[in-house]
Amino acid sequence: GYIVACIDPRGTAARGEEFRKCTYMQLGKLESDDMIAAAKWLATQPDVDVKNIGIWGWSYGGFMSSLCIMKGNDIFTTAIAVAPVTHYKYYDSIYTERYMRTPAENERGYEDNAPLNWADKLKGNLLICHGTADDNVHVQNTYELAERLVQANKQFDMAIYTNRNHSIFGGNTTL
């Protein structure tokens, strides 16, 4: 059987302004810490197989799943990252600068939680999926992460969907 948990880490809505805004200038840091802590708590539950704890996400969720399997490589054994942001320097500046300011103003915020910079920490199974026509999270994010993983001699799986956009929809597309 399967157990599925949906975690609302710091930065999500419905828990007050301080909880929602605490990720400002450090996207990924607190959220990944919370996801890793939640997975570690789940691992203490009697029906959870600690050797098979996975995480998956799409877009920002892909950013989180790729970061979590690298930062939380002692708890997550598998991750699926679909259309992941792997470094905010490659993402839409209107969105990014609203939450992170510019790279010149917040270099540590950009670098410290970029999955690219954690690639050498990968231990488990990672599947990365991306459409080449994604105009939201450009496929460069995936290509750069793949290059870092190769340079770190890490095994991973990758599925590239030619001419598919951010939703990877249409034709015989399957994930």
Q: Residue ranges of each PLM-predicted region?
A:
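Conserved alpha/beta-hydrolase "acid-adjacent" motif
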Residues: 135-144
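Cap/lid segment of the alpha/beta-hydrolase catalytic domain
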Residues: 1-60, 86-87, 91-97
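Short beta-strand/loop motif that positions the catalytic acidic residue
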Residues: 122, 128-130, 134
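Mobile cap/lid helix-loop segments that gate and shape the active-site cleft of serine hydrolases
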Residues: 22, 34, 77-78, 84-124, ...
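C-terminal catalytic histidine-bearing segment of alpha/beta-hydrolase fold enzymes
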Residues: 127, 143, 150-175
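Acidic beta-to-alpha connecting loop that harbors the catalytic carboxylate
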Residues: 132-135, 163-165
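Short glycine-enriched nucleophile-adjacent loop
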Residues: 62-74
